[in-house]
Amino acid sequence: MGLLATGEKSHLEVVRTAIRELDWAKPDVKLTLGPEGSAWAYGYQNILLCEYYLRTKDDYVLPAINKYAVTLAKGRDAAGLWGHRMANPEANRGQLHGRLYGYAVMNSSSLPCYISLLLAQKCGVKDPELSAAIEQGRTFYGSFVGKGTLPYGVHDPNTKAFNNNGMSGMAAIALSLAEDKQGSAFFSKMSLASTNMMETGHTGHFFNQLWTGLGAGLAGPSATTAFFKETAWLHTLNRKWDGGFTYDSGEDYSYSGFNDAASHLLNYCVPRHQLYINGKDADKSIFLSAAAAQQIAGLATLDVKKLSEDELFKLLDHEMPKVRQEAVWQLRGRPHKYVNDIVKMLTNGTALQRKSAVEYFGYQCPPDQASLAVESMAALLKDSKQEMSMRADIASSIANLGAGAHAYYPDILKLVLEKKPEDKLGEIDMELGRALVTMCADPYAAGLVKDKELFYAAANKLMAHKRSYGRATGVKMISAVPLEDFHWVADSVKTIMDDQDLTYTSYHNFEPKIEAVGIYARLNIEGGIEGALAAFDSDTGKAGFKIRMLMSVLPVYGANAKYILPKVKEINPGKFKGQWDKIIADIETADPVAAKKMLKFEEAKNFGKTK
């Protein structure tokens, strides 16, 4: 890849010969969706083959490109993403796009897969699965634009950094290839602003140093110059006497055996624009001027603690989420004259100022300041002319008032039930669900379950959320549901307990199931422990997560769990052995009198109906 990036014809024959010697590049290469199919390998291998074809038009690699593209497209999960491996139909009741092995989605492995699919499309590959995968990826990665860098998997945007182990650079390239100008511009700037964190990264910084410079280069020559001005030392200090490069990392599992020379060469060749990952045919309309590039690069060392209140106030309109957030927290932590101006921003500010103002009066805002904005925020919360995303942000902020905001609990329930065609990933509903749980942990005790039809309709909708964090908010809302009301939510709780829905777009987190089992245990309903144990029968899901889930469940049942201990003892708890053994011992010694008669699910479901 590095040799291709030079654009020098003398290197093309070397690359051509090398590719023909690679088993994984042969026309008859065998790929699989099974456990042996590696998303890491398939994604990067396909990028090389595609870039090689687009540079040389050598038809030899087209059969392999077609196989990689279709296999990857078929191997994506319901979110359109990948983990260490593919979503194997054999582990998902024969269905495509089911659940991934282990702890599921990782953006660090998914982004190269997605980039390779976009390149394969440029190579002429056509397949319905490929088209669907590209559209899903565009929606998912586009959802982070303007909000933060990429997280580990299907999580919230990371607003505390400009970059996360090269993922801002990868996202810039992916969205450039997907013709998302706004997204490419945003993430190329995020990459340019992260020059001070080039030696950071989960299990090592290899991907950071590979991709970040490539992403920054999409912002044009001035951005490339500014980036290399700040990072040239890295290349120099890693250079060896023989012209190669070292990979220096003290991290465990830090990509041993990787060729770091190729990473440095690809970055050195950014100005040549010979590869698509190096900015070939990049959109020049997003190129930064020299002054703008210097300003963005300077954000890497911005210390908001040294800024005046006036300077911090101006940053509430900054395009970078990290800068705005730091300005909010720093300004709020000092005595200043701008509180009333920030209240006015809620209604009269720019889009970014309004977002900053909502955050200012949210989490950990001093009550004396937050109280000044309640009336304005409540009016916006109820205003149907406001964007739904803004109303959800306001719900999140106002929820931090706790009991002081209970009057708005029904308004948020109604927002959950409103149709939101723009909320393709359910992010707005998830935020509203979190607001409800933050505002009141037990709405029954607080007297907030007045309109049962409204309350349970919102809870049921959230429990059907495709993301685990969304489902968890729905179950938490009803964690104290009385038996006479169980029929309102019984089917939703059972669906979460059974956990068989392969259309979930996040499923690694067992929090919804733990909450559901808690309801079963509190209402003395049979099947809770069996539901928890069923997770161990699935090939997907991380074993450690399953063990921790079961350790949360068993103590809730206490003496009622004695009958299941023989099965529990068959499980190897690994590093959790100490806690595991104590839980088992506590159950074995529990007073038998404490055991209660269990209700069958249908009995519990019908209890309230028959009263």
What are these regions (language model features)?
Residues 1-2, 174, 217-218, 295-304, ...:
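Structural detector for internal amphipathic alpha-helices that build alpha-solenoid repeat scaffolds
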Residues 1-4, 38-51, 105-118, 163-176, ...:
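Well-ordered alpha-helical segments within folded domains of soluble proteins
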Residues 3-17, 52-69, 118-138, 175-190, ...:
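Structural helix-adjacent loops and short alpha-helical linkers that scaffold large soluble proteins
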Residues 12, 278-279, 305-315, 335-347, ...:
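Amphipathic alpha-helical scaffolding segments comprising HEAT/armadillo-like alpha-solenoid repeats
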Residues 13-31, 64-82, 132-150, 179-200, ...:
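Long, well-ordered core segments of solenoidal/helical folds
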Residues 38, 106, 319-320, 349-350, ...:
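Short inter-helical turns and helix N-cap capping residues of alpha-solenoid HEAT/ARM repeat scaffolds
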Residues 79, 90-209, 219, 226, ...:
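Extended ligand-binding clefts on enzyme/binding-domain cores
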Residues 180-189, 215-218, 222-318, 581-611:
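Terminal, non-catalytic domain-edge segments
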